UniProtKB/Swiss-Prot annotation:
Reaction equation(s) it catalyzes: L-olivosyl-oleandolide + S-adenosyl-L-methionine = L-oleandrosyl-oleandolide + S-adenosyl-L-homocysteine + H(+)
Listed cofactors: Mg(2+)
UniProt source species: Streptomyces antibioticus
Annotated pathway: Antibiotic biosynthesis
GO molecular function, one term: protein homodimerization activity
InterPro entries named in the record: MycE_N, SAM-dependent_MTases_sf
Gene3D superfamilies with a match to the protein in the record: 3.30.1050.30, Vaccinia Virus protein VP39 (3.40.50.150)
Entry's Gene Ontology BP terms: antibiotic biosynthetic process; methylation
Record text on subunit structure and interactions: Homodimer.
Residues annotated as binding S-adenosyl-L-methionine: S166, E195, I196, G197, I198, G199, G200, Y201, S210, D227, R245, Q246, D268
Catalytic residues (positions): H271
Protein name as it appears in the record: L-olivosyl-oleandolide 3-O-methyltransferase
Keyword Metal-binding: yes
Function: 3-O-methyltransferase involved in the synthesis of L-oleandrose, a sugar attached to oleandomycin, a macrolide antibiotic. Acts on monoglycosylated macrolactones and mediates the conversion of L-olivosyl-erythronolide B into its 3-O-methylated derivative, L-oleandrosyl-erythronolide B. Also able to methylate other monoglycosylated derivatives, such as L-rhamnosyl- and L-mycarosyl-erythronolide B.
Length: 386
C-alpha cells in the first residue's frame, strides 16, 4: 500500500477522535484489511528496539465484525520489530487480538489510559508443560514490546533524535529542548508538520532522520519533507518530495496548497540566507493560526559562504538574522506612527518570536491586532527631570 498521498492516514486521524459509529463507518469505507495494514505499519514503527534475550513470533489478530485479519510480528533481540510470514513460524507462545476500532483509537486517538478488556491474549497448548517456561517468559517479554507501542507514552525528544540519528541533539546541535518547550502543548494533536531539508544528500538510505523523529514525537501527526536532493520514498505518515530548491516560490506554494496549512514549518534546508528569507516570506502565510515557523542554523548569517557579511562583525541587511530582528518591529507595528499603513501580512499575523544562541529562531502566527496602547497613555514621561 502506498502512503504517498496520506489518504488512508488522514481518514484514520479524522475518525480516531470521533464517535464509534463514525470510526466504524470509516473502517468499512476503506476496508478492514487496508486500515489494518496501516495500523500494523504504525505499530511496527513505534516498537522500541527489543531487549528480550532471544527471538519470538507474536501473532496479531485484528477483529472487525466477523472478519479476522491475522499478522505475525517477529521480535528479535536488538533488531527492529518486523512483519513475518505466518507459514512455518512457531508463534512465541501467544496470540494477541484486538478490535480494529480499539487498536485504531489506541494508536491515533486522543491520549487516554488503557482500559481493561482492550485486548485479548491466547496461549498455545504447548505452553502447558514445564519444559516451556523459558519460552513463556520470552513470549511475555516480546508481547510487552508490541503492547507498549500502543500506549500514549512517547519517549523524550532528545532520545528520539538519538534513536533516529537526527543531528538535532547530541552532536553539533542541541535543539530538542527548545523544540519541546514550544511544541509539547500540541504533541497529542492531529498536526501537520513540514520540514524543509531531509538530509542524506546523494546517499538516500539514511535520509529523513528528523522526519522519523517528528513522526514518533507527534503520534497523531502527518509529516512532510522537501529537499533539493531526490528523496521520494515515503513511509506511513511521512511524505517526501523530490529535488526542488527552497528558494523556488512557485514550488513551495504548490507544496503548501497540496499539504497545508501546517501547524509547524521547520527550515533546516540549505541555510543560505537568501533561501531562508524567501522560504519564510512564502510559507509563513501557510501556517495555521497558532502555528510555529522555525528557522534553524541562523548562525550562517555570520558566514560569507552562506550570504553573510565579509569582514564585518554584524550580519548585513540581507541575512536571516537581520530579517528576524526586523520581525520584532513587525510584532509592534501598532505602536509605530506609520504602522497601520505599512503593516504587511506578516506584521498583522505575527504575535511573538524566540531566538536561541547559534541554534534556531521560532515565530508564532496568530492575529496581531490588539489595538495598540490607548492614546490616553502619554507618549512622553509624565514626570519632570529638570
Amino acid at each position: 500500500m502506498s502512503y504517498d498521498d496520506h489518504a488512508v492516514l488522514e481518514a484514520i486521524l479524522r475518525c480516531a477522535g470521533g464517535d464509534e459509529r463514525f470510526l466504524l463507518n470509516t473502517v468499512e469505507e476503506w476496508g478492514a484489511a487496508e486500515i489494518t495494514a496501516a495500523l500494523v505499519d504504525e505499530l511496527l514503527f513505534r516498537c522500541e528496539i527489543p531487549q528480550v534475550g532471544g527471538e519470538a513470533f507474536i501473532g496479531l489478530d485484528v477483529l472487525h465484525g466477523a472478519d479476522r485479519i491475522s499478522h505475525v510480528l517477529q521480535v528479535t533481540d536488538g533488531k527492529p520489530v518486523t512483519s513475518a510470514e505466518p507459514a512455518g513460524q512457531e508463534l512465541g507462545g501467544r496470540t494477541w487480538s484486538s478490535r480494529s476500532a480499539t487498536l485504531l483509537r489506541e494508536l491515533f486517538g486522543p491520549p487516554s489510559g488503557r482500559t481493561a478488556g482492550g485486548f485479548g491474549v491466547s496461549f498455545l497448548p504447548d505452553l502447558r508443560g514445564p519444559r516451556t517456561m523459558e519460552g513463556a517468559a520470552l513470549a511475555a517479554r516480546a508481547t510487552n514490546v508490541v503492547l507498549h507501542a500502543t500506549t500514549n507514552e512517547t519517549p523524550p525528544l532528545d532520545r528520539l533524535a538519538l534513536r533516529y540519528e537526527s543531528d538535532k541533539w547530541g552532536g553539533v546541535h542541541w535543539f530538542t529542548g527548545h523544540y519541546d518547550r514550544h511544541l509539547r502543548a500540541v504533541r497529542d494533536q492531529a498536526v501537520r508538520i513540514l520540514e524543509i531539508g531531509i538530509g542524506g544528500y546523494d546517499d538516500l538510505l539514511p535520509s529523513g532522520a528528523s522526519l522519523k523523529m517528528w513522526k514518533r514525537y507527534f503520534p497523531r501527526g502527518l509529516v512532510f519533507g522537501v529537499d533539493i536532493f531526490d528523496s521520494r520514498r515515503a513511509t506511513s505518515r511521512v511524505s517526501r518530495r523530490s529535488a526542488a530548491r527552497q528558494d523556488d516560490p512557485e514550488f513551495m506554494r504548490r507544496v503548501a496548497e497540496e499539504h497545508g496549512p501546517f501547524d509547524v514549518i521547520i527550515d533546516d534546508g540549505s541555510h543560505i540566507n537568501a533561501h531562508m528569507r524567501t522560504s519564510f516570506s512564502v510559507m509563513f502565510p501557510h501556517l495555521r493560526n497558532g502555528g510555529f515557523y522555525v528557522i534553524e542554523d541562523t548562525f550562517t548569517s555570520y558566514w560569507p559562504g552562506y550570504g553573510g557579511p565579509s569582514g564585518a562583525r554584524c550580519p548585513s541587511g540581507t541575512t536571516a538574522l537581520e530579517m528576524v530582528k526586523g520581525l520584532i518591529d513587525s510584532v509592534h507595528y501598532e505602536e509605530r506612527p506609520d504602522g497601520a499603513a505599512t503593516a504587511d501580512y506578516i506584521a498583522r499575523n505575527l504575535v511573538g518570536l524566540h531566538a536561541y544562541q547559534t541554534t534556531s529562531s521560532s515565530s508564532r502566527r496568530a492575529i496581531n491586532k490588539e489595538g495598540g496602547i490607548p492614546h490616553t497613555v502619554p507618549r512622553e514621561p509624565f514626570w519632570n527631570d529638570n
